[in-house]
Structures are given as structure tokens and as C-alpha cells.
Amino acid sequence: MRKFLIVLLLPLLVLAQEKMLYKEKIEGIPYEDVKILLKTALDGKNMNVLAVQDVSQKPRMTVFYVCNLSYGEKILRTFPEFGALAPCRIYILEKEDGSVEVGYINIPNLVKGFRKYLTPQAQEVFLQADKDIKEAIKEVKGGF
């Protein structure tokens, strides 16, 4: 058990030293529209939205629990402990100025922390998932 906890906590130390979250500020799009657009963009990237949790009303915050099942299967096959961190969580937060922040854990830094436990193929899968999520968020912003 102790070894398992150490395996899970070491990456957090790496994350604490570097940028822990990837965030994008979205302006000019209402909060509820961002939620709909993000769900649609994630679906387009084959990132299944497994659950949506409205965390608070003031400020409004929602968490999407997302997973690409084929990515998850490839990673869990070689690193079953990853199940403690799955699925990916993407938050949507309404800021005081009316903008909306969308973010999630910085996956490249997560890969750095777990590198010795991941095969090169699993690392590639993580980085592809990161690319897919970033592209979905940028699509919400209006970029392609």
C-alpha cells in the first residue's frame, strides 16, 4: 500500500514544481454555451463525457469527466494504477469579469512524473489525449 501511495504522490511533487494546470480563457461566449460547445467538441474528438457535475453556482463551476475508452484501455493494460486518476477531469469556471476559464491537469507534466511506469506507447497515448483535449478547448474559443 505504501509503495502504491508513493507511486501516486511522486508525480504531484513534479506537478507542484511546474505548471500544474492547462487553462484557456474564453471571452464573449456565455457560460452555458461554453458547456454545450465543449461537450460537442469533445464528442468530435472521441472523448466520451461520462458525467457532468455542477460544483457551484457562485461562481458557476462545472466538471466534465471524460475518457477516450481506447486510450484508457491501452494505458490501463500497462499501468493499472492509473485507474486512480481516471477519467480526465475538465473544469469550466465562470470568472467575475464574465469570461469563462476551461482547464485540466497538465498532462505532459503528469507523464513526466509517471514516465518510469509508462511504456513509450502509453506516453504517446497520454500526449495524444492531451492534444485532443486542447484542440477541443480551442475549438470552443473559435480557433481550429
Swiss-Prot record:
Signal peptide range: 1-16
Keywords in alphabetical order: Signal
Keyword Nucleotidyltransferase carried by entry: no
Gene3D superfamilies named among the record's database cross-references: TT1751-like domain (3.30.310.70)
Keyword Cytoplasm: no
One matching Pfam family: DUF302
Family annotation (InterPro entries): DUF302 (IPR005180), TT1751-like_sf (IPR035923), UCP021774 (IPR016796)
Protein name: Uncharacterized protein aq_1800
Organism whose genome encodes this protein: Aquifex aeolicus (strain VF5)
Classification of source organism: Bacteria, Pseudomonadati, Aquificota, Aquificia, Aquificales
